[in-house]
Swiss-Prot record:
The keyword Repeat does not apply. It comes from Rhizobium leguminosarum bv. trifolii (strain WSM2304). Hexamer; dimer of trimers. It catalyses: homogentisate + O2 = 4-maleylacetoacetate + H(+). The gene is hmgA. Homogentisate binds at residues 364, 385. This is Homogentisate 1,2-dioxygenase. HAMAP family: Homogentis_dioxygen. Belongs to the homogentisate dioxygenase family. PANTHER family: HOMOGENTISATE 1,2-DIOXYGENASE.
């Protein structure tokens, strides 16, 4: 007999109005969806309440330093060994993994795309992932990939976990219901969510539009954490209390289901007779979370000059080299521009880091035209980039009174590794062939005579 029961903390049926979250970043949480399901005083009782099984999910080696040691104890209806059977090969040909050196004819250059097309076929979130760039090597847990996603169907009886890295999901069009082993998150545009490496989940659509679209950073390296604030001090940027981790929720469903796995760049599928989202209680610090980008508290120049964009870092995945990120997640949120005698947009730049950008909402101040919500750009290491001719002339001649840059939200996945373009991205019909022309209007002003020109 098919029976589906979705219960959240407190035994309530999980609806949007009853979803609850626990605040904090990296906390050691505890939560149960049935009273008494969580053991007290120990992790692995001889027998667990409700007939549950105890299982540990480790996100770091056992001997990692305490500050970076991550694990959670899960109390579930069946142990995970019952959530996989014999695997078969599966294929998601547009989801690529580093190292990926696709053959295509597009030469090196600065690149920009309009939004990827809406699908004509029925696609789930898993089927709708399209890789734009890859960097590093997933097998050695180094680097990242930048993906776009577009879908129109729910993952009803399909579940997925990614052994290659954690997934930072950035919705641009359409809200998501993200049902993970450890709870449920509703995530809308201008919010993000993170699903840890190895964690089972499925994604459902919420709302009535025709298509759901967004971006994903697949981080192969050390997990995302909050960047150090340095002399900024103890406050501002992304504050820990604004990160929300879901309370326990489980799906009690006895029906044929499929579990999909990504492992070292290959995909596999196995069939089971029940939902694997069966964690009734858990405690620990290896957990998913969501974050509202509108709660980011930006800092900036309050007298002159334009600071480095690192001041807008929300999350960073570090490497062994201090201050050098495997990947940074950076946003460009609404903010006041008040600098005197200053060119206020981002300056022209060549960078050892490689920058993938997307636009969630509004306009980006360095390029008011051509870079549209749902679009993407790629400026690889040491390739020059900066404001287009229109933005330069406007900012260079503007009256420098305080101006609020509002109704905008751009972001960047920035990595120390070169981002290799996939064949899909190189041949995408929305690639802007005329992107480089946006700088054509930047004429020579120098004539050898002193003075402002």
């Amino acid at each position: 007999m098919d029976q589906t029961s979705i219960q959240a903390s407190g035994g309530e049926s999980a609806t949007a109005s009853t979803l609850k979250y626990m605040p904090g970043f990296g906390n050691d949480f505890e939560t149960e969806s049935l009273p008494g399901a969580l053991p007290q005083g120990q992790n692995s009782p001889q027998k667990c309440n409700y007939g549950l099984y105890a299982e540990q999910l480790s996100g770091s080696p056992f001997t990692a330093p305490r500050g970076t040691n991550e694990r959670s104890w899960l109390y579930r209806i069946r142990p995970s060994v019952r959530h996989t059977r014999r695997f078969s090969n599966a294929s998601y040909p547009l989801w690529k993994t580093a190292p990926c050196l696709d053959e295509h004819s597009l030469p090196l250059g600065q690149l920009r795309w309009d939004p990827i097309p809406a699908p004509e076929e029925r696609l789930t979130f898993l089927e709708g992932v399209r890789t734009i760039t890859t960097a590093g090597d997933a097998a050695t847990q180094v680097g990242m990939s930048a993906h776009a996603y577009v879908f129109n169907q729910d993952m009803v009886d399909d579940y997925f976990f990614n052994a290659d890295g954690e997934l930072l999901i950035v919705p641009q069009l359409g809200a998501l219901r993200v049902f993970t082993e450890m709870g449920i998150m509703d995530v809308e545009p201008l919010e993000i969510c993170l699903i840890p490496r190895g964690m089972m989940f499925k994604i459902l659509k919420t709302g009535e539009q025709a298509v759901w679209r967004g971006y994903i950073c697949e981080n192969y390296g050390a997990k995302f954490t909050l960047p150090d604030r340095g002399p900024i001090g103890a406050n501002c940027l992304a504050n820990p209390r604004d990160f929300k981790t879901p309370v326990a929720a489980f799906e009690d469903k006895e029906t044929p289901c499929r579990v999909h796995v990504k492992w070292c760049g290959k995909f596999y599928v196995t069939e089971i007779g029940h939902s694997p989202l069966d964690v009734v209680a858990w405690h620990g610090n290896y957990a998913p979370f969501k974050y509202d980008l509108r709660t980011f508290s930006p800092v900036g120049a309050i007298r002159f000059d334009h600071p480095d964009p690192s001041i807008f870092s929300v999350l960073t995945a570090p490497t062994e080299d201090a201050g050098t990120a495997n990947v940074d997640f950076v946003i460009f949120p609404p903010r006041w521009l008040v600098a005197e005698h200053t060119f206020r947009p981002p300056w022209y730049h060549r960078n050892i880091m490689s920058e993938f950008m997307g636009l969630i909402h509004g306009q980006y101040d360095a390029k008011e035209e051509g870079f549209v919500p749902g679009g993407m750009s790629l400026h690889n290491m040491m390739l020059p980039h900066g404001p287009d001719a229109l933005a330069f002339e406007k900012a260079a001649n503007a009256e420098l009174k305080p101006v609020k840059l509002d109704h905008t939200m751009a972001f960047m996945f920035e990595t120390r590794y070169p981002q290799q373009l996939t064949k899909y991205a190189a041949e995408l019909e929305t690639l802007q062939d005329d992107y480089l022309e946006c700088w054509d209007g930047l004429e020579r002003k120098f004539d050898g005579t002193p003075g402002i020109k």
